[in-house]
């Protein structure tokens, strides 16, 4: 499809999802392949009830995993034995292709470096947490131990970033194809970032536990050392 056809298709999806809600478009984040807007119920305050709606078609989920999804309402009704209501409203479980967690991990790893060098890391500190937590997962450890698979997917991630970042106004100091080399931009993990990281549990995490910034630094040092060992 052409870019204009993509834009029209995404607009139809956006209109369907936002039907019955008030909407404020985020023009700086809208183009033919991406639509961003804040939406909120007509009888509620925008300041307290708005949700950011993001719809995009820039990147294919590669590699992907097929996952089943159902609404919380359907799950609740089934738990309460109200199958007649589920049937009445034709609530169904759907299967969707989702980005495999290994690619999600690498996307997060690369985005932290990009935001650090481009000066936007203070707004993306949650990414540091995501990388640190994902690194502890057994499936991520298995992935990192598979050198051939890691090199292949890291190459794909870098090349994809390079292609799409050409269309965005980012710092020329960031090279998406370059070596990870955490030691060259570690200075951006400064006191400001530490302070925000150690207070994430107050508003952004599903835990009340204060996070260790030292553990986060160690995670990125480990990742950088591993990437260096495979020439990345």
PLM features: what roles do these ranges have?
Residues 2-232:
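Structured mid-to-C-terminal alpha-helical surface segments
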């Amino acid at each position: 499809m052409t870019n204009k056809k993509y834009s029209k298709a995404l607009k139809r999806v956006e209109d369907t999802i936002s039907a019955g809600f008030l909407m404020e478009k985020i023009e700086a984040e809208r183009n033919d392949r991406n639509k961003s807007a804040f939406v909120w119920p007509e009888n509620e305050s925008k300041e307290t009830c708005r949700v950011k709606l993001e719809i995009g078609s820039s990147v294919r989920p590669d590699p992907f995993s097929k996952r089943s999804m159902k609404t919380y309402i359907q799950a609740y009704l089934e738990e309460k034995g109200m199958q007649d209501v589920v049937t009445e409203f034709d609530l169904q479980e759907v299967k969707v292709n989702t980005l495999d967690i290994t690619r999600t991990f690498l996307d997060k790893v690369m985005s932290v470096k990009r935001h650090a060098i481009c000066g936007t890391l203070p707004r993306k500190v949650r990414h540091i947490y995501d990388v640190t937590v994902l690194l502890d997962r057994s499936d991520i450890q298995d992935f990192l131990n598979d050198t051939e698979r890691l090199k292949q997917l890291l190459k794909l991630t870098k090349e994809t970033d390079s292609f799409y970042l050409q269309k965005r106004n980012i710092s020329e100091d960031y090279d998406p194809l370059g070596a990870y080399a955490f030691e060259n931009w570690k200075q951006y993990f400064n006191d400001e970032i530490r302070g925000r990281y150690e207070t994430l549990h107050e508003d952004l995490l599903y835990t009340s536990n204060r996070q260790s910034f030292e553990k986060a630094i160690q995670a990125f040092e480990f990742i950088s050392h591993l990437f260096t060992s495979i020439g990345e």
